[in-house]
């Protein structure tokens, strides 16, 4: 047999690694659909009028090896010095056991938000640990499971305080020693809501003039102050107190709760999460019990399952935007779950004694640094501090900063005559000596045996914290590794099975895309370091911005929004700024279809707009006549509309251009939600359809993993006329920045995870990205075809095609057998699947999105499982299965069910091994169905007492 060349391309990442179905499988799927080619299917699914004419101009795809080489080139252009800038960002040591077993572990980073608690018990416990740690440290009983960053958390606290305060004042006081970036984010949030931000000295605060006040603790310039008297005065005026507290400092200092604070916020970045040039990190929020229903973000609570065993779940969801829409507490959806898990594990790893020891070491080194500078003749402020000092240097500021740079150290420029210095757990004695040299010392040596303290005695913490046994476990690495493994094994993530959540795009997060994230050159840069030290970052961001402009048809891109919801908010601020610049600031009406994401109306409310709801037609499209009538009715005040494309019903609407034209004709701007961009990349572009602004969910379309509920990124693309109104930031100017104010603490949001999306674009190239979109549409239509044998497909176009997702009308099961959509979701767990999106956008249905990454075998396994569920419902309807005591109503089934007494009228085999379930590698849900009502009636959002963990006696 002669030697012949193969046409197999092993390094073709797009077609061999990212896209699931093989060419042979695609042929089989196309045959099932009755179309001769993939292009023929796309022609049937997409209206001709929305197709883009030019291919993506990305250049050829790179191999994994070449992509890593390019990432290394960029990394080498970053210069990582020792940053003692502080301002809320600190050097930290990520314990390798946490780095490897959490951040680099797909069992953790590929999971979805834990809406299905039975298959999310591991990360729910880790997030409950986070809440417990923060509640204990801050001395306040209620904690949420993270917010986006400290600045956003402060803005959310302001809005929360306004909702809850009994004061009629419109002012919000911000202490002048709060972090500057926090003040900027607060100003941006306050202005559209008509809140007056009063920045000033604490001693000048008039409690009667404000509904709440924010204090930094310790202050940005180092001051440690007891705010008890000020808070008491605020309460006397019926106003609330918010304290932005450093969690490491709270191991040594009196807690905000002990001072009487109503709300505490801050960042947990220094708990083992790298700075990443600004993010991502988990912010926290805690509050008094009286304010719990006003709190934004996710709250993990303790409930029970059907057997009465302890189980965790998301609590008080009626506060959230997917239910309350424009009346929601916040538009926050994605937060920072993965980073909160890392921070919680840092707390478990060190325990309270370890955290206190780290804090004492940091303070002792800071005190020694200060004493040395005092010996050199400099005036050091304040007298009492934790880790930050400010040095009066007069006209020597520039000389000293430059000298420190030569020593490899970044210091903070404060005003024109001061320098700020913040130490952290990584600060070495030789770094302190280098700073002394920069200040002119010769031969001064750091003596680590010299004990110096500068904490006020009356402020030292006496209350206990982190007393739960989980923070006192054996911290040998073997036990830590096993604990994290046990939690991971309780969860169902993409490393086990497809997660076909509609509108969530749970696609492959390739290992090669994730690798550069943890490289020191990307991970260890301070966001306020001199710009020339981040040249690699800036080059990458500029290239990625250009790629995304090509994808979307827009002219400019802002990378600052660090979630999809923040992207919506920033996009609407751009529209608002545009109207105001043209003297039309009165425009405040936003048209939003009934089928819109719940974040849309919540975001509109945040910029001070009024929401006018537009009906949907019977085929799922926007009701064009209703849209036209309402645009005409509100023509004088129309700010814009928010639509999703393809629609949230999973269909490419042919009327999209007409909707845009109507909006523009009445003076409005068009916001096209980018949640469904996975159906458009390379085939259509929102900017070409008439959109003025869109956000992209990089954690959906561009491969940033969901992390069990964050991180995410929501950059916005805009047409040229909106570019002057993009977000701004005090530390950055130029392309991608405008005049809208800051919407995140860091200029580029969470830039370290942009490495993932950038690598994805390099690996795929323009042709690969376009092929991925086509296969996403193929997979969805193949599943719709197979599943139509058991369930009506609720919406399709006139050719019977869907976009990248489809809605299964599972209400038919309720009609014939009393089987609810929740029963179906729980039964899918027995099959080893996470349920599709439940009851949205249509109550009682499932929205299925397989993405391009799933191979045919996994699609078929899911279809087999769903069709078997239909057969079980038919058996109930026929009377061969009991109406209540059946596999659907009792799902999910656990090992405890299997080994216990079996008194059910169906077999163990039928319960635990339905079609679709693996036999050898079966996933076992760790708990039975969770009682949601019990969890809300009996809210517990910190770790339950140790007795609850005890195994029941025989």
Swiss-Prot record:
Lineage of origin: Bacteria, Pseudomonadati, Pseudomonadota, Alphaproteobacteria, Rhodobacterales
Annotated family: Belongs to the GcvP family.
Protein name: Glycine dehydrogenase (decarboxylating)
Pfam families cross-referenced by the UniProt entry: GcvP2_C (PF21478), GDC-P (PF02347)
Assembly mode: The glycine cleavage system is composed of four proteins: P, T, L and H.
Function (record text): The glycine cleavage system catalyzes the degradation of glycine. The P protein binds the alpha-amino group of glycine through its pyridoxal phosphate cofactor; CO(2) is released and the remaining methylamine moiety is then transferred to the lipoamide cofactor of the H protein.
Cofactor: pyridoxal 5'-phosphate
Xref: NCBIfam families: gcvP, PRK04366.1
Sequence positions bearing N6-(pyridoxal phosphate)lysine: 700
Catalysed reaction, written as an equation: N(6)-[(R)-lipoyl]-L-lysyl-[glycine-cleavage complex H protein] + glycine + H(+) = N(6)-[(R)-S(8)-aminomethyldihydrolipoyl]-L-lysyl-[glycine-cleavage complex H protein] + CO2
Recorded GO MF terms: glycine binding; glycine dehydrogenase (decarboxylating) activity; pyridoxal phosphate binding
UniProt keyword list: Oxidoreductase, Pyridoxal phosphate
Any Gene Ontology CC annotation: cytosol
EC number: 1.4.4.2
GO biological process, one term: glycine decarboxylation via glycine cleavage system
Family annotation (InterPro entries): GcvP, GDC-P_C, GDC-P_N, GDC_P, PyrdxlP-dep_Trfase, PyrdxlP-dep_Trfase_major, PyrdxlP-dep_Trfase_small
